[in-house]
Amino acid sequence: MKKVIGIISLLLSVTLATANPVDFDKAFKESAKIEKQIKKTSFPDRTYLITDFGAKPDTPDEPCHEAINQAIVTCSLNGGGTVVVPKGTFYTGPITLKSNVNFHVEEGAVLKFSTDQSLYFPGVITRWEGLDCYNARPLIYAYGETNIAITGKGTIDGQGSKEAWWPMCGSPRYGWKEGMVAQRNGGRERLLMYGETSTPIYKRIMKPEDGMRPQLINLYSCNTILIEDVTLLNSPFWVIHPLFCESLIVRGVHVFNRGPNGDGCDPESCKNVLIENCTFDTGDDCIAIKSGRNQDGRKWNIPSENIIVRNCFMKNGHGGVVIGSEISGGYRNLFVENCRMDSPNLDRVIRIKTSTCRGGLIENVFVRNVAVGQCREAVLRINLQYENREKCNRGYAPTVRNVHLKNVTCEKSKLGVLIIGLDDDKHVYNVSVEDSRFNNVEKGGNQIKGAKDITFKNLYINGELVK
């Protein structure tokens, strides 16, 4: 037994005690109030076919983004409506969304984005791994728009592969060979330096030779957004990246992206977000909530807040639902429920990752009714020492508090709960797991250090009650 208790008792700064029970019903009533605050998109009953503007299917050497963008601009200027991609395979370059436009990809339609990097420059203002810059134009982009949507049962294919985009990560695993353009050849390091030295954003201009891959969808400072039903494949980089957005719904979306840094949905400094009924099969985190990296996050000081995740299936990825690591602006109020996760390649179920480079306050995380077949490492991992080798200005101790799990089951993992705090126990506290069962836990239990007020109530690991 008492292997579990033995592991815990040998670790520092841990308190296992009977605490006041967490009122999950009350917490999720708050999430219902948040959901009511999310503004819904609405579009006039007007339709614009991209083929009426000159777009032709099956022309890989003649991408039709100019026709698509003309249809979008016309629709917006006329008061809004729906721009339709009809059945067929259309090859395109970068697309820019405009206010009051529903970009609708019909069932049977496939939108394939060109891998000609020159089409995506000059760049636009965005963030790359939490750092402000001008980088390659995202494949679908919007800046400062209101009431926009990407809908339909069609497919949007970024065409990332070992032959295009993915080798730029610099890893032979993804097709990189000596002499190829790659982010590790100085571009990423220079951008990190820009952030640490507070270089003005207008001077942070990334070029094609820097190898900084674009996102599939990047919505910058937009509000009232719907992404629904589409299938998103093979992004060069992160798949869905809302940045400084408010009132966002991601519903019924299927994400398949096994590429490097292939995060599924990364709301960054966003407020009032609903992600539901989605499937994620990714090469990195399925959902990763962010709020800026280091000085850039602290400068804006805009937390992500009020995010609801429910009825999703996380099939593959580094983490199911993740906060961080670019989380310097902080995070509050996450509600996760009724999700399924199952893969030997899924590393962690719930993950919080940050460091003394980042700082920030992360609080109020509520997770219930999550069923996990298996994960590679831990059901819950909180790590305040993420990427300790990172070159940065340190001294910004983060705080993680009020993290609560209930009715979470996992059939196989290495650990139950893994918490890596700082040298004291002041920066991770008030964490609880209740009414949960973790079976076939290889290392026998939990590993916790640098934390306090950790409560386990009716938590069974390998059939034994953790006391």
Regions found by a protein language model. Give the residues of each.
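Beta-rich accessory regions
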Residues: 38, 69-74, 337, 356-357, ...
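Mature catalytic domains of secreted/periplasmic carbohydrate-active enzymes
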Residues: 84, 116-117, 124-126, 226, ...
